[in-house]
C-alpha cells in the first residue's frame, strides 16, 4: 500500500518508520532538516519537501498515494485533511484538530465525499 505521511516531526517520523516496514511510505513536510534527518536513517522511506499550502504540489502527492496519515499541528492538519478528503483519500489523523472544526467541517466533508476519516488517533 502507498501511504503518505504528512509531517516529519518526532511523532511523524516514528509513524513513517513503522509503516514503512510493510508499505511504501512517502513523508511530506516543509521542514527540510527534518526530512534529511529521516532520510539519513536509511530504509525505503521517500521524502518530499513542500508546504500543504502549495495545493498543486500537495494534491499531486496525495493523488499518488492510497492513504494519508496526518502527524502535524492542528492548523496545518486542517489544510491537509481538507485536501485529502476532497481527493477522496482515506485519512488517519494523529493531529489535534479542534473538536468544533472537526465536527462542523472535517467530518461532514468526509461524509459528503464518502471517505474514511479517523481523527485523533493516539490522543
Model-derived segments and their meaning:
Residues 12-13:
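N-terminal Rossmann-fold NAD(P) dinucleotide-binding loop
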Residues 27-30:
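Conserved acidic E/D residue at the C-terminus of a beta-strand in Rossmann-like folds
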Residues 51-64:
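Conserved Rossmann-fold cofactor-binding substructure of NAD(P)-dependent oxidoreductases
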Residues 52, 66-81, 94-100:
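N-terminal glycine-rich "phosphate-gripper" loop used for MgATP/nucleotide binding
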Amino acid at each position: 500500500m502507498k501511504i503518505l505521511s504528512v509531517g516529519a516531526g518526532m511523532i511523524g517520523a516514528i509513524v513513517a518508520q513503522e509503516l514503512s516496514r510493510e508499505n511504501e511510505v512517502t513523508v511530506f513536510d516543509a521542514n527540510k532538516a527534518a526530512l534529511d534527518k529521516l532520510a539519513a536513517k536509511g530504509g525505503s522511506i521517500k521524502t518530499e519537501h513542500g508546504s500543504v499550502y502549495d495545493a498543486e504540489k500537495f494534491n499531486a502527492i496525495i493523488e499518488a498515494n492510497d492513504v494519508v496519515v496526518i502527524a502535524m499541528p492542528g492548523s496545518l492538519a486542517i489544510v491537509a485533511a481538507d485536501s485529502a478528503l476532497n481527493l477522496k483519500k482515506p485519512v488517519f489523523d494523529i493531529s489535534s484538530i479542534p473538536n468544533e472544526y472537526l465536527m462542523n467541517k472535517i467530518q461532514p466533508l468526509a461524509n459528503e465525499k464518502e471517505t474514511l476519516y479517523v481523527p485523533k488517533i493516539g490522543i
